[in-house]
Each structure stands twice: as structure tokens, then as C-alpha cells.
């Protein structure tokens, strides 16, 4: 009888411990989600200095993840990643010398920049307009790719990376969020500007790749510091 009672007590204890652990894990997960938010925005990059002399404006999208260290959302950890295209060229040509002009393809060359940073953010989390400032460190990459695609269906037949490079970067910036619905503060309009100070990197600009006779190409890379201003307009959503 004592053995049976002991087993029952042990089983009950195991159930209580398991339930308590599950509740603790669920509570921690809910708290993590409650303190998390993401922002998706359309982005414009405005190169400055030597970079601005070599390339033009870029357009793309950016994503931001925020984790609030305190319960009010005053101090947060922020991670940003963006991708913008700052140049595009295309030309039509014969698929091959054997086929001739009966089958044509389009060669498209695109230039991209990818800033990635992480750091702290300070915000005023209440009111109709909520300002914030942020800083961070990271890197930004420059990539130029060429695709061969069908003229009509845009099906990519082949792809090649002409040049890729990256440099250390640091960022400072600020912006505002505005609740879109007065009582639904988990969805907010997000507008910001960031200054990104990038180190020296190699990159290509429109016109850097020249086709030569005999199927050869000449690639002239550029190199400079990579400073730019990034403007963002999007929406922030809390969980």
C-alpha cells in the first residue's frame, strides 16, 4: 500500500513539475513576443562623398527587428538589414553564333548594396508621435550580378556575379513612429533617416562593364569610402 501511495505521489509530483515548467516556458515565450516588433519599409539610399560621385540613388526594401530590454520600450536592441538597387543595364543579343538572331536573349546587369547593422535604440514610447534615435555597427556589401534571360518570358537562363565586396560600417539615425489606429498601438507608421559611414570597398557602377570583341568584357571597378544616407518609410508591427 505504501509503495502504491509513493508511486502515486511521485507521479503527481512529476505532473506538477511538468505543468509548471510548461507554464514557465510559455510565459517566457509570450514575454519575448510581447517585447518584440518588426518593421518593413521601402528604402532610398543617397550616397554621399566620393560614393555619391560614382553611383546614383538606390531603391529597395529594409527590415528591422526590435527587442525591448525594458517593459516600456524605452531601450531596445535593434537589428537592421536593407537591400537597394542603385543601377541597372540591359541589352539584347543573339543566343549564340550558331543560332544567330533567330533566338534572342536579354543580358541584364544589376548593382546592389546591402547594409546590415546592429545596436541600441532609445525611444519615447507614448504619445501620438514617438521619436527615437539609434546607433549601431555592422557592414555593407556591394554586389553586381549579370543575368541572361528570355526576351519574352523573363526566364533566367544563367547568372554570374561580376563583383562582390564588403566593408565595415557604423550607423547613427533617428525617426518617429505614429500609431496608425488610435487605440491599436501595435501597428505604427515608421519613418526614419540613417547616416551610414562605410569603409573602403570596391564596387561597380553602370558603365563599369564594357563588352569587347570576341566575347570578352572589360570590368573597371571603383574603390572609395562608402558613406550614404538611408531614408525609410514603412510600418512597425508588434506581436
Positions of PLM-derived features:
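Short glycine/proline- and aromatic-enriched beta-strand/turn motifs that initiate or cap beta-hairpins
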Residues: 22-73, 223, 230-239
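Residues on the lipid-exposed face of transmembrane beta-strands in outer-membrane beta-barrel proteins
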Residues: 40-44, 61-67, 83, 116-124, ...
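Hydrophobic core residues within well-ordered beta-strands of beta-rich domains
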Residues: 36, 59, 75, 114-116, ...
